[in-house]
């Protein structure tokens, strides 16, 4: 049986989502350990997005194939009973065998938070980048418009040796300012390694007038990571939601 799992987590003390041999401190590893204990055998899950170390999630999606049918509510309760306090399962549903959380995803929504006030947001410090300066929002919005659409984002990819296509589509980059912070919402069909964090660093450089708008357009042509902006800290980034097509959602209802 195939189960879809909706997960949320505080990524502060983890080495990212993906299981690693050198450490047990990954989100995937923690969930697999609990499921394996429940089933009495080794279990592997597939995640929709491989969030980096320190990145958070409110709507990560995973799926797992179990040999025996189990009530989804029981799976959810068991996971929440034994998972660490900074990982929680919001929902477990039974889905068709062919459903794959990553391969069937049509897009993702990420949110990046930036503190711009003089006073630090002490109680939110794990989830927001303390930039401490107020950039020009109009310039940032204009730069965001340039980056929206289908482009080769190689300049915004941390993996310089990546041989696969670096072409991605960003549907929207929405910037909002509220109470001493800037919230940037990125919606796209997929994102490269550190792509959103590099995009954010680049937008901030434009907003601080350290980079021109014309240079942003050039970044899409030169395909050179060294030319793009700095990589914003991981802690400001949260995976908000994984998108699936409406037809897929209907087919998931058994």
Q: What is the predicted function of each stretch?
A:
Residues 1-254:
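Structured-RNA-binding interfaces characteristic of tRNA pseudouridine synthases
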